[in-house]
Amino acid sequence: MRHFYYIVTFICTLFFLSPVRAQDLQIGAYYFDGWATEKSSAYTPKLLNQYQDRMPIWGWRDDNIEIMERQIDIASKNGIDFFAFCWYYADDKGPFNEKAIRAKPAHTSLDLFLKAKNKNKMKFCILIANHDGAKIEGEENWKRTIGYFADNYFSDSQYLTIDDKPVVIYYLPLDAQPFISSMNGEAVAKGYKGLYTMSCGYGLKDYDAMTWYNSFDGKKESEEQDYEDLFTWIERIRNKIPEKTVVAPLCSVGWDKRPWENVEKSVYYVNKSTSAFREHLYRAVDYLYSRNTPNSIIMIYAWNEYGEGGYLAPTVGDKRGKFLKQVKKTKRYARRKK
């Protein structure tokens, strides 16, 4: 995500009762909708000139329906069940502004997904990216946001639900927490059973679930780390979660945001390998099974965070989608574990 906070873990926890079944496993990938215009701040000179291997096979721009349909085909064929689209409020800290929201280029890919003729191959949901520049303040604005979702997204047959409730993920959940009850009430008023709310952050009450957006060792600055150290970090954190709390684990494709830094100051991970990523995914499945989690979800960071080094989409440097194919192998692994 272009606006990154040095919050090193966003952990999400689901509360379920019955044993997990392989067919319940759903794997989602976060979709960063920042590549729609030439003026996007995501296109840094450093990214374009020094990291050309990260360019997706369809080019940097993703703002036409043919490319979205191609992404749906590729993702669904390889085991991705849904995209979690980053969604941005307008106006920052101000009153709900539907006109400005609809005009945001950062919602282009979500709009294209809704129009795609092959969207029945995947589900989708919303991650509210309520960070600086897209802050939501006050009960009324949170309620209007959910009302907008109900009118424009929840009614779509492909919207992801759990227990017949639309799934909404909160990037900065503490800001939204006081208004969860009101948001649920708004969803009920719109004809739904309520929301299935997932918070990025551990230990917050009122949410139905929790998950990470991404995670890395933020204490290490300007330091090169081995790829497998990233997985060790993520798995160490989730293993500390109390047994009574059921976790929707994160699997990260990588972290290296040097293309977005004028001065390289954050940790980054090198020596990427498909085998290490596959084992990372397998351990997430094992983790879900060990905690008897139904309706199990694994979240992957990310489908297309090219600037931050977290991407599954096939690129110039991975034209055959070798990392993406590990997701399909994970589905087979889950079936064998059944």
Predicted regions and their residues:
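Bacterial N-terminal signal peptides
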Residues: 6-16
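Sec/Tat signal peptide C-region and signal peptidase I cleavage site
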Residues: 18-22
